[in-house]
Regions:
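Acidic/glycine-rich beta-solenoid
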Residues: 1-233
């Protein structure tokens, strides 16, 4: 194990200069195993983890508190199958679960639960012949069947470069109803997005993240010579 220490001085006019220190500890494989933060002589552990004998992340402790501990599980292929903790739990299924079995590492279904929630939420995934996602079908409970399709997403087409040409998204329409919030058509110039049109006009409700179409012109997005986005109408 070796350690790297980074110092910062925090000067401010009329104030006492304070010293801030980050201490990084590494294991035998040169992976970060612990990060400690010291400010004004007070030290806390930001990150403390264990990789285990198979070199996979098994546990992660945040802010030095067992309350913020996360544990990770894997299958025999070393694919991540679960994250468990007091604040977040997630399960990933490949050739098991309620989705269509996948044996190539693609996820067939997933479930998760946040904090003290009692509701288990999840998605089932389907893929095309090139193993690109076509449908992410939402549901609740372990069977991913209750309140089906409330937040589903469907890719309606890809171009020859593998870029998405169409996307349908479902979400909350009112306090009691759910439905289609986006029906997007994406136009590209090569691999650069140039225009997005939405066939559905739905105002955001609650945490609804419906697409907002700011303009309907051919060149809604523009880029510089390096491909960085410079305009979004």
């Amino acid at each position: 194990m070796h350690v790297r220490i980074v110092f910062y001085l925090l000067p401010a006019s009329g104030k006492t200069t304070r010293e801030e220190v980050y201490t990084y500890s590494y294991d035998y494989a040169d992976r970060v195993s612990k990060v400690e933060h010291t400010l004004g002589g007070s030290k806390i552990t930001l990150y403390d983890c264990d990789y285990g004998k198979f070199r996979r992340l098994y546990t992660k402790l945040l802010h030095g508190s067992a309350t913020n501990k996360q544990s990770y599980t894997y299958n025999v292929c070393s694919w991540l199958t679960g994250i468990s903790g007091t604040r977040f739990t997630q399960n990933l299924y490949y050739n098991t679960g309620v989705g269509t079995a996948k044996y190539n590492g693609s996820i067939s279904s997933m479930t998760w639960k946040s904090g003290n929630e009692s509701t288990v939420r999840g998605y089932k995934f389907t893929y095309d012949g090139l193993d690109r996602v076509l449908n992410a079908t939402y549901g609740e409970t372990a069977s991913i069947s209750t309140n089906a399709n409330r937040f589903s997403e469907n890719v309606t087409g890809y171009d020859k470069n593998g870029n998405i040409k169409g996307l349908q998204r479902y979400g909350q329409l009112s306090s009691t109803s759910y439905g289609l919030i986006d029906n997007l058509t994406l136009t590209l110039n090569g691999n650069q997005l140039s225009c997005v049109e939405d066939a559905v006009s739905t105002a955001a409700y609650g945490t609804n993240t419906a697409f907002v179409n700011g303009a309907s012109v051919a060149g809604e997005y523009a880029y510089d010579a390096n491909g960085n986005l410079t305009k979004d109408l």
